[in-house]
């Protein structure tokens, strides 16, 4: 019988990968970490049974998470990444002319596994762990606690697990208020928000909470390899930024595989019933 890794979503929906072998498994202080060699998508990183990425396709997540916000902001110089222990989000941020990017990851084991076995970070994680990267800094700790006590960010990116379970606090009004205070004016906050079809209630709830806090709130989706796509993202704006418009000249300098200015125009095409529900909030 062929071996497979299956992630089960609500209502009995599953995403499966045929696997060659399990490479790694560990129960860290926070979660179960697994790495598999898949048949057609490279290595798969899973946390508590949920797919975080497959190495042949991870850019379909990291690019739409990072670049729309970075290109919509007029001058993003200081960036905070909450989560993102695999290094992919920081890697994409550093394609831009930033002065500093700080990554706050609660689970150091995720960083070590990603550095040694996933290797999508172009050596960033090693440099960050040793404090030797000129622009990218690392803090091992709770992103919620960090953001309570730190200010002055142009862009804040939440690269967290799905909006259920332990990460649910990162989709609360309380957290969003700390984020708003931590942003410069103008500033942009972006977070992944789960499967459009399977986490619809969580998406609507998070959108409603963000509307209480931010000056403008946007939603968009993107087809992500390895996830129950389309995958939702939420954006909160502090100040006067039109997230639907990006700097196309800056975009030309980026090395991109999935997201680009042409794709940006399609980001906001949510299914009709979800679009109408969010517009009523």
Curated annotation (Swiss-Prot):
Report the CDD domains cross-referenced here. Answer: AdoMet_MTases
Question: Per the database record, which ranges form the PABS domain?
Answer: 6-238
Q: Where in the cell is it found?
A: Cytoplasm
Where, by residue number, does S-methyl-5'-thioadenosine bind? 31, 105, 142-143, 166
Give the binding site residues for spermidine.
62, 86, 159-162
What is the active site of this protein? 159 (proton acceptor)
Pathway listed: Amine and polyamine biosynthesis; spermidine biosynthesis; spermidine from putrescine: step 1/1
Q: How does activity depend on temperature?
A: Optimum temperature is 90 degrees Celsius. The enzyme is highly thermophilic. 50% activity is still observable at 103 degrees Celsius.
MF annotations from Gene Ontology: agmatine aminopropyltransferase activity; cadaverine aminopropyltransferase activity; spermidine synthase activity; sym-norspermidine synthase activity; thermospermine synthase activity
Q: What are the protein's UniProt keywords?
A: Cytoplasm, Polyamine biosynthesis, Spermidine biosynthesis, Transferase
User: What interactions and quaternary structure are annotated?
Assistant: Homodimer.
- Name the UniProt record assigns to this protein: Polyamine aminopropyltransferase
UniProt organism field: Pyrococcus furiosus (strain ATCC 43587 / DSM 3638 / JCM 8422 / Vc1)
């Amino acid at each position: 019988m062929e071996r497979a890794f299956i992630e089960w979503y609500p209502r009995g929906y599953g995403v499966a990968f045929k696997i060659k072998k399990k490479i790694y498994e560990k129960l860290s202080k926070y979660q179960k970490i697994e790495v598999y060699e898949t048949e057609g998508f490279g290595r798969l990183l899973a946390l508590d049974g949920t797919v975080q990425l497959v190495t042949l396709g991870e850019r379909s997540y990291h690019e739409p998470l990072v670049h729309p916000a970075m290109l919509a902001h007029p001058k993003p110089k200081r960036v905070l990444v909450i989560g993102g222990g695999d290094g992919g989000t920081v890697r994409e941020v550093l394609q831009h002319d930033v002065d500093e990017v700080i990554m706050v990851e609660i689970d150091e084991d995720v960083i070590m596994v990603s550095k040694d076995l996933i290797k999508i970070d172009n050596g960033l994680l090693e440099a960050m762990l040793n404090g030797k990267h000129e622009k990218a800094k690392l803090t091992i700790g709770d992103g919620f606690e960090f953001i309570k006590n730190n200010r002055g960010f142009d862009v804040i990116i939440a690269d967290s697990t799905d909006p259920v379970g332990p990460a649910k606090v990162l989709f609360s009004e309380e957290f969003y208020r700390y984020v708003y205070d931590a942003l410069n004016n103008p500033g942009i906050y972006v977070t992944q928000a789960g499967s459009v079809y399977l986490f619809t209630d969580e998406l609507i709830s998070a959108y409603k909470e963000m509307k209480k806090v931010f000056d403008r709130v946007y939603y968009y989706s993107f087809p992500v390899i390895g996830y129950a796509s389309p995958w939702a993202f939420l954006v909160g704006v502090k100040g006067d930024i039109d997230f639907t418009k990006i700097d196309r000249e800056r975009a030309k300098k980026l090395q991109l595989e999935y997201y680009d200015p042409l794709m940006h125009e399609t980001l906001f095409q949510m299914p009709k019933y979800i679009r109408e529900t969010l517009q009523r909030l």
